[in-house]
A protein has these predicted regions:
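Solvent-exposed loop/turn segments at secondary-structure junctions
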Residues: 62-65, 82-84, 96, 112
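Ligand-binding pocket segment of bilobal, Venus flytrap-like solute-binding proteins
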Residues: 1-76
């Protein structure tokens, strides 16, 4: 909402950390509330687009790219002002085979191996230096392709840890209005 209201991606969390920023975000959401179609499963965005129930949506890029590549859907992904989220892998404290887990992490962290993910789904490799190992035809389909990294927001887990509970309460109250 804040980016739609003119806040630069780099400034979103600084603005959203203030009461005025939260009010600004919800004021922007108010302008589109009656037009929003909410989804709660990853398969829904391509279905909503295909049925023409919506003309644009947020989505996991892999779902949209799959609809384009496999189903011939006439969709276009817009990368400008995208929100990037990263998954994490952890070794639980007290794991029975931590040495094996460390070997696994070392293996998948190699740029050449990390880049292979793009052969199976269009979620980009997490290592920047892996991009040079991605097939040239796959690279433009990845959210973290160099050409797509000019205007983006990285989801800030620390911010959401600090402010998420209050923002979710405010959001749920807003939805109920």
């Amino acid at each position: 909402a804040l980016m739609a209201d003119g806040v630069a991606p780099a400034d979103v969390y600084e603005v959203l950390a203030t009461p005025e920023g939260v009010d600004r975000a919800f004021k922007k959401l108010d302008t589109i509330k009656q037009d929003i179609v909410w989804w709660d499963a990853g398969a829904q965005p391509p279905q909503l687009l295909a049925s023409k129930e919506v003309v644009m949506t947020t989505a996991w890029n892999g779902r949209i790219q799959n609809a384009i590549d496999k189903d011939g859907a006439p969709f276009k992904i817009v990368w400008n002002n995208q929100i990037l989220e990263y998954d994490m892998i952890a070794i639980p404290k007290g794991a029975k085979n931590p040495e094996l887990a460390y070997k696994y992490l070392a293996y998948i962290s190699q740029p050449e191996i990390n880049a292979k993910l793009a052969s199976y789904i269009t979620y980009g490799p997490v290592r920047i230096d892996a991009a040079s190992f991605v097939a040239p035809d796959a690279l433009p389909k990845l959210p973290n392709a160099p050409d797509h990294m000019t205007a983006y927001l990285v989801a800030d887990t620390e911010f959401w840890g600090d402010y998420g509970e209050d923002l979710v309460k405010r959001f749920n109250a807003w939805l109920a209005q």
